[in-house]
Amino acid sequence: MIMIRFLSFILFFSYLNSGQDYIDYPHPFHPTSSKSGMVVSQNILSSDIGVEILDMGGNAVDAAVAVGFSLATTLPRAGNLGGGGFMLIYIKEKDEIFYIDYRSKSPKNASIEKLLGTKKIPDRNSKRWERVDYTYLASAVPGTVYGLLEAHKNFGRLELQEIMKPVIAQAEEGIVVSSDLSYVIGVTPQLKSDKESYSIYYKDDEPLEEFSIMRRPDLANTFKEISKNGIKGFYEGKIADKRVNAMNQNNGLITHED
């Protein structure tokens, strides 16, 4: 018992003299509190853009919209223009909660037979499912852009062009590839078989490494169309034409009607 107490005293004394907190509160895996607002996402570069929007006088919705678009650059598996999502918005002054559902939808001409090549749903172990896991048949009609812009239109404070400016700059100037993004690229070999994905996520025939620089000029151009023309900039015009052309060339189902 005396020895245990003596060791406890030594450990406690060492802790007091270490000059460091035993719990690293700023660490991402520990709770963090703030009195002036907070921006949280799965990538710090995107979160920084959210903070920038708040510093510009934007509200929480402005920041959320900017972060959502930014994640298409920094961590596309967590946020992307080709997907969808949901959003809850609380208006303190009215004590009201609004819900926006912008989940992706199936193309109008989709069917079990077109998707899986059979009229009956096959066993989940069937290789037929690879058709809707890794090919253009897996693509649903994207809702992300519609949902984010709908939130901004109804609840945002800043002009859309103000929100999109740092997002565009980030895609043009490039980002430092995170360990998360590098890992996901490395464990997704299907990216290598797609010409566009290969040109973005590979260098010298190898997946982009952590700390390397990734630039997205094409994505920046899409952001510019959205910034200039809003929803129509993504669901109509040249961006929509490119998307439909890609579908036609790769046996996808999304059409202009969708």
Q: Over which residues does each language-model region extend?
A:
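Hydrophobic h-region of N-terminal signal peptides that target proteins for export
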Residues: F9-S18
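Long, structured ligand/cofactor-binding scaffold of large enzymes
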Residues: E52-L54
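Noncatalytic scaffold domains of N-terminal-nucleophile
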Residues: Q20-D48, A60-N229, F234-E236, A240-D258
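Sec-dependent signal peptide recognition
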Residues: M1-F9
